[in-house]
UniProtKB/Swiss-Prot annotation:
One of its GO terms (cellular component) is actin cytoskeleton. May be involved in protein-linked oligosaccharide phosphorylation since the deletion reduces the negative charge of the cell surface. This is Protein LDB18. GO terms for biological process: actin filament-based movement; establishment of mitotic spindle orientation. It comes from the Eukaryota.
Amino acid sequence: MPGLKLVEALEYRCDRLERLIGAGYSANSDVSVQLDELYNQLHRLYFQGLKYSQDLLQLFNTFMAEDIENVGAPDDICIFASCFDDIYTLYSAFDELNSQYMEFCQISKSSLDQISFKDANIETKQLKKLPELVDNCNIMILRSIAILNRFIDWNIEVNGFFQFQKKRLLNLQKVIYST
């Protein structure tokens, strides 16, 4: 069932994005206005993903600083390190995506106002990059969420282990003090 819920959540998100992107569309509006709106939405999406990744890195750093002594098991440290490396890779990819986005915006904004109608076909090659940028941003956000889920599952497992050990120690303590 969790897979079905994930699919339903992704379908809901896709429908929501389609409504958001399509909400500003009007057959009478200028293409450059529509592109500006798409640029702004992509930029907001990028910064939301970037903030999400930064918060996740802070969580990882805090966890590493506070709980590394309690973890102890080499497998747990490897899992944590792999999550941290993945998040750092995504964080770097977000920076690369932003630089590509800014370059695309500069090229498109400077050229859209100055192109003649007969040259418009040449400039549309730049516009074809926009869906790829949106897809890359969505993929990175989904990967961040998947890594966060791995981290949370692992953290729950480790916490469960330590709670079990604490319960055993308390039971032993009761037995010792009762005798």
